[in-house]
């Protein structure tokens, strides 16, 4: 009887699974047929000419946005952007540009070292007046950037107003494959402490980090600070490669698991480490996501590093690239990943998110405890919680306004033009600061201090309650003080 019961139960599972599969297939077939019928009917009957590309793209985006923020459709024309995301390379001249005003010229902000821009004499502050015969007036910074990019080996012609000589010259630049390194800085903080800032996880960043580590080791490094703040992640394979540098061969780094067959994977280190003894601090914040969290979580779970900063973003999802017809691609979430202790850093749901998308407060009752290699308690449910919490510096709203308005950058470029022959070791004097203040006052930018925002809100509430007349003198004095503070 027991055998018969087991057979009956097994058959029930098989039948129900098959029925579910058929139900899902029917739903997909029905949905596809309805969608195609709607498009055909619109094309035949709609009162105006049908913007097919626009409505199809809107439909695709709406469908994918209902799943998660990371599953996206990539049309053929955006493949170059995908390559930039994967390997941080593109075909171009190798320079950061800046456009202070839409009707002005685009300005070279920084030519990369060894880039075609630098080789052909483009300097910081040079104004690009024309690109291939087209004026940059009226073009956005992005439109100018797009015109500078192209297939390596092709050329682009610029009409340039040189910042130093004030001469207008024609320059023809041959585009090259530009690679932007993820290791943006590596140096010594003191005689024994090395510091490495890593901004991404594109191809071969583990090799870049290895080289930077060996260079600092040669300079006497005895302790390492690895800064992953603001690092939004990238390739999982590079995260595994970085952990491999600091833990014994064969150590578990991360595992992934999804619903589809073949998505459960376990990733261990496969090479001999560089150094398993050097003390490491990993710096993180709410901008540290994905592969950054894999590295941080693994080094924390293996008790190989001390994590400092603020809680990480909380993106524990794995994306894969799938080819689509007409050279399009689908970046689709296929699995969740888990640290060596078994934690998933993905936020429990999207309701526990801050405005910037990072994980918000989650009560311990909704999370689970896990143990590190040495028995320390860590928790899941959203991001990696640092061993030592250190809040970042909170800049004033005025500072943010000046930075994001471009006023500081614009003044710096003007300063370069006026002081083209300045020594490399120059220092800003008080008169330079006064010049910046005067320059900023000539620019219109949106700035309201937090205090002014709260004051206006309080004043409205007092007016509603009929109390503002009794406090008019105090309110006027406070408003005057706030205006003086803004000045």
Q: Where are the regions that the model predicts?
A:
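Conserved functional hotspot residues or short segments at active or partner-binding sites
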Residues: 344-351, 355-487
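Bacterial Sec-dependent N-terminal signal peptides
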Residues: 1-26
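Cleft-lining beta-strand/loop regions that shape enzyme active-site pockets
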Residues: 20-31, 35-52, 75, 107-111, ...
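Residue-level recognition of conserved beta-strand edge/terminus positions
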Residues: 131-132, 381
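N-terminal, post-signal-peptide region of Sec/Tat-exported proteins
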Residues: 47-82
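PDZ/PDZ-like peptide-tail recognition elements
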Residues: 70-110
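Polar, glycine-rich mid-to-C-terminal structural blocks
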Residues: 291, 303-304, 310, 314-373, ...
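Structural motif
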Residues: 125-127
């Amino acid at each position: 009887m027991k055998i018969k019961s087991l057979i009956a139960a097994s058959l029930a599972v098989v039948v129900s699974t098959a029925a579910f599969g058929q139900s899902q297939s029917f739903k997909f077939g029905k949905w596809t047929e309805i969608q195609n019928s709607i498009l055909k009917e619109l094309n035949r009957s709609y009162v105006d000419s049908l913007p097919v590309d626009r409505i199809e793209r809107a439909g695709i985006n709406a469908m994918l946005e209902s799943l998660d923020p990371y599953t996206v459709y990539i049309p053929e024309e955006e493949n170059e952007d995908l390559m930039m995301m994967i390997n941080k390379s593109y075909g171009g001249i190798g320079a950061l540009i800046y456009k202070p005003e839409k009707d002005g010229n685009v300005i070279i902000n920084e030519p990369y070292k060894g880039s075609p821009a630098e080789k052909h004499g483009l300097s910081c502050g040079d104004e690009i007046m024309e690109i291939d015969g087209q004026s940059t007036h009226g073009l956005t910074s992005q439109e100018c950037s797009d015109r500078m990019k192209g297939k390596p080996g092709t050329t682009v012609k610029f009409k340039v107003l040189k910042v130093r000589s004030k001469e207008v010259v024609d320059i023809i630049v041959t585009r090259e494959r530009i690679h932007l390194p993820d290791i943006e800085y590596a140096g010594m903080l003191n005689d024994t402490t090395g510091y490495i800032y890593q901004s991404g996880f594109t191809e071969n960043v583990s090799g870049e980090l290895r080289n930077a580590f060996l260079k600092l080791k040669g300079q006497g490094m005895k302790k390492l600070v690895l800064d992953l703040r603001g690092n939004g992640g990238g390739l999982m394979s590079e995260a595994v490669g970085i952990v491999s540098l600091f833990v014994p061969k064969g150590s578990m780094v991360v595992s992934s698991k999804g619903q589809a067959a073949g998505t459960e994977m376990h990733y261990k280190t496969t090479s001999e480490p560089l150094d398993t003894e050097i003390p490491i601090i990993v710096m993180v914040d709410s901008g540290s996501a994905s592969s950054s969290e894999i590295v941080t979580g693994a080094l924390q779970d293996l008790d190989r590093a001390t994590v400092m900063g603020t809680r990480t973003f909380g993106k524990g999802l794995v994306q894969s690239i799938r080819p689509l017809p007409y050279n399009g691609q689908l970046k689709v979430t296929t699995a969740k990943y888990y640290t060596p202790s078994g934690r998933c850093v993905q936020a429990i749901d999207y309701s526990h998110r801050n405005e910037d998308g990072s994980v918000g407060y989650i009560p311990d009752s909704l999370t689970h405890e896990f143990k590190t290699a040495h028995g320390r308690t860590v928790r899941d449910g959203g991001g990696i919680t640092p061993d030592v919490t250190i809040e970042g510096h909170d800049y004033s709203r005025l500072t943010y306004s000046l930075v994001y308005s471009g006023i500081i950058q614009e003044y710096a470029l003007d300063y370069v033009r006026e002081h083209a022959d300045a020594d490399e070791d120059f220092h800003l004097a008080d008169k330079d600061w006064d010049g910046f203040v005067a320059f900023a006052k000539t620019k219109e930018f949106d700035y309201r201090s937090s205090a002014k925002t709260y004051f206006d809100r309080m004043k409205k509430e007092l007016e509603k309650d009929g109390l503002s007349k009794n406090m008019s003198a105090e309110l006027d004095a406070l408003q005057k003080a706030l205006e003086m503070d803004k000045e």
